[in-house]
From Swiss-Prot:
This is F-box only protein 22. It comes from Homo sapiens. Directly interacts with SKP1 and CUL1. Interacts (via C-terminal) with KDM4A. Interacts with TP53. Interacts with MTOR; this interaction promotes 'lys-27'-linked ubiquitination of MTOR. (Microbial infection) Interacts with SARS_COV-2 protein NSP5; this interaction attenuates NSP5-mediated inhibition of innate immunity. The lineage of its organism: Eukaryota, Metazoa, Chordata, Craniata, Vertebrata. Coiled coil: none annotated. Predominantly expressed in liver, also enriched in cardiac muscle.
Length: 403
């Protein structure tokens, strides 16, 4: 097959000259045809000629909705690697957006330790990095990838935001949230490594990642990793305290490990502890969080908490739900009844996809940031009372109209 040098160059004698003319000159027709192609195919045909390249750019600009790829127990159990890596490799061929930022979460047991390590600690760590690297390589080079591993995963199956979300407390699972570049919205990863020799946070470090001196800041997803190490939890609280008193939504928790952060120039140290996350800035963003404390212990009280979240009146189109729960909740907490909190969320938010994890501590409280940016609290919670255990944080993030 000869390479195509230009739309106007057609060397095949069987090609209809009228079709050649249309596809070489009529941008409206070309653009209409290209709207049916996934992003990977669009990038391939963009090299055909200048007209097609411009049409591809316009088509990609219209694809601004967040997309997700998920892998649950149905996809698990194969020997050729973690299910999330396999499913992402398959599904990226059909994704219609060009991912600019990716947030993925996977279960720590199988993502970190795919092979029996037989007490050889170093072998287990090497496997972890190889799995993460394989996943990172699937995304475009310019894409910002942040990945964490946790004891359990909350995921919505692919296909529709109205699919029943699954609380997978044990087992091979994961998801990847794909954020395109959205006009008027900036998503920035941040990372602060705990250095025993220097625990001071410089103001410029926070400013560079949009956490300070940023009037557009609306939401911060924040995760402490390896918090079982000495001083790690205190460091997490120190970092969060630098921006927690602002009128923003703050949600997250403590996870096992940081597995990917492609914005970092240096290789990740799986033995290190620190704080990582994403900041969301833009006046179009609306968000809310609710805290399900230890008093929430059955379906009725879980649904009451979702009613508080519903009362925030956050638009549900182009909105993502997050659930950050303690490993002590879930099936056993609700007297051998599974999926209670995820089902309660689905009852009140029938079309919003839900993602998250079961972790080792939760960060957040009842807060609402509305369109006119008024901070409200649904009940009396002190500003500094953001760190919890045996609780669940439910969050909504609305990224504005996708049009």
């Amino acid at each position: 097959m000869e390479p195509v040098g230009c739309c106007g160059e057609c060397r095949g004698s069987s090609v209809d000259p009228r079709s050649t003319f249309v596809l070489s000159n009529l941008a409206e027709v070309v653009e209409r045809v290209l709207t049916f192609l996934p992003a990977k195919a669009l990038l391939r045909v963009a090299c055909v000629c200048r007209l097609w390249r411009e049409c591809v750019r316009r088509v990609l600009r219209t694809h601004r909705s967040v997309t997700w790829i998920s892998a649950g127990l149905a996809e698990a159990g194969h020997l050729e690697g973690h299910c999330l890596v396999r499913v992402v490799a398959e599904e990226l061929e059909n994704v219609r957006i060009l991912p600019h930022t990716v947030l993925y979460m996977a279960d720590s047991e199988t993502f970190i330790s795919l092979e029996e390590c037989r007490g050889h600690k170093r072998a287990r760590k090497r496997t972890s990095m190889e799995t993460a690297l394989a996943l990172e390589k699937l995304f475009p080079k310019q894409c910002q990838v942040l990945g964490i591993v946790t004891p359990g995963i909350v995921v919505t199956p692919m296909g529709s935001g109205s699919n029943r979300p699954q609380e997978i407390e044990i087992g091979e699972s994961g998801f990847a949230l794909l954020f395109p570049q959205i006009e008027g919205i900036k998503i920035q990863p941040f990372h602060f490594i705990k250095d025993p020799k220097n625990l001071t946070l410089e103001r410029h470090q926070l400013t560079e990642v949009g956490l300070l001196d940023n009037p557009e800041l609306r939401v911060v997803l924040v995760f402490g990793y390896n918090c079982c190490k000495v001083g790690a939890s205190n460091y997490l609280q120190q970092v969060v305290s630098t921006f927690s008193d602002m009128n923003i939504i703050l949600a997250g928790g403590q996870v096992d490990n940081l597995s990917s952060l492609t914005s970092e120039k240096n290789p990740l140290d799986i033995d290190a502890s620190g704080v990582v996350g994403l900041s969301f800035s833009g006046h179009r963003i609306q968000s809310a969080t609710v805290l399900l404390n230890e008093d929430v212990s059955d379906e009725k009280t879980a649904e009451a908490a979702m009613q508080r979240l519903k009362a925030a009146n956050i638009p549900e189109h182009n909105t993502i739900g997050f659930m950050f729960a303690c490993v002590g909740r879930g099936f056993q907490y609700y007297r051998a009844k599974g999926n209670v909190e995820a089902d309660a969320f689905r009852k009140f938010f029938p079309s919003v996809p839900l993602f998250g994890f079961f972790g080792n501590g939760e960060i957040g409280c009842d807060r609402i940031v509305t369109g006119n940016f008024i901070l409200r609290k649904c009940n009396e919670v002190k500003d500094d009372d953001l760190f919890h255990s045996y609780t669940t944080i439910m969050a909504l993030i609305h990224l504005g109209s996708s049009k």
